[in-house]
From Swiss-Prot:
Cofactors, names only: Mg(2+); Ca(2+)
Name of the protein in question: Probable lipid kinase YegS-like
Keyword Disulfide bond: no
High-level lineage: Bacteria, Pseudomonadati, Pseudomonadota, Gammaproteobacteria, Enterobacterales
Binding site for ATP: 37, 63-69, 92
Function: Probably phosphorylates lipids; the in vivo substrate is unknown.
Domain DAGKc: 1-130
Record GO terms (molecular function): ATP binding; lipid kinase activity; magnesium ion binding
Amino acid sequence: MPHTLLILNGKESGNPEVREAVKNVRDEGLTLHVRITWEHGDAKRYVEEAATLAVSTVIAGGGDGTINEVATALMSLPADKRPCLGILPLGTANDFATGCNIPLQIENALQLAVKGRAVAIDLAQVNGEHYFINMATGGFGTRITTETPDKLKAALGGVSYFIHGLMRLDALKADSCKIHGPDFHWSGDALVIGIGNGKQAGGGQLLCPDALINDGLMQLRLLTAKELLPAVLSTLFNGEKNKNVIDATVPWLDITAPNDITFNLDGEPLSGRYFHIEILPHAIQCRLPPNCPLLG
């Protein structure tokens, strides 16, 4: 069997369940290398090392940010030398893994990441150098996910993002911008901007419910209203129609703003006044369960 490399977020290096799952894989006679990340840039270095280890799969062990860092590093390799991506969900929200029906039980998730079916999936590229595998959020949604205290996330998991968001309703500020894509033009003030390759963000909220990771498209969702915000947020996440929620499905978008906007790319903040976002169809192979609801 080809070798596998697990890139593990340093926060999980002492996790006894991870150690047991790794031991069980090795006891089957499979070669599983493990590398620990301690600072930004480690994942890229380990992905580059994967080429010298004859690795066919690189597993991201951590949350959505770790998955993003590993997927971004994979894109720096030539397409014909790019290992498959495996996912071991160990974060707070685990939005991409949950959306894919990847098991949250560590043993089962690692077995899938090592042996699962490899499927070609899309990635979204931002300004030619940044990527997201799940979702980019702007406006209020970004401030929730980037400012939610670590202690609250640890205590409450994904629901902490929503609770913290409700606590911050008095601090709402819309982002003024223009958004342009194929047969789509919009300008105005957006409270929430969601651009989904995957369906959910912020700890399980279905922000882009129609998104798929292998259709060459991304779903854009805008929330434009400030009035009766709790009711509008409920509409945004439960799929009901509302004139303040704008939807589009496109292969690319240009976003311009008079002031800096911060987008959260799978947990990684990126600020600026211009964003070109496009889907790269079938950019990487990912080991996914057969019942993955993000596949078309």
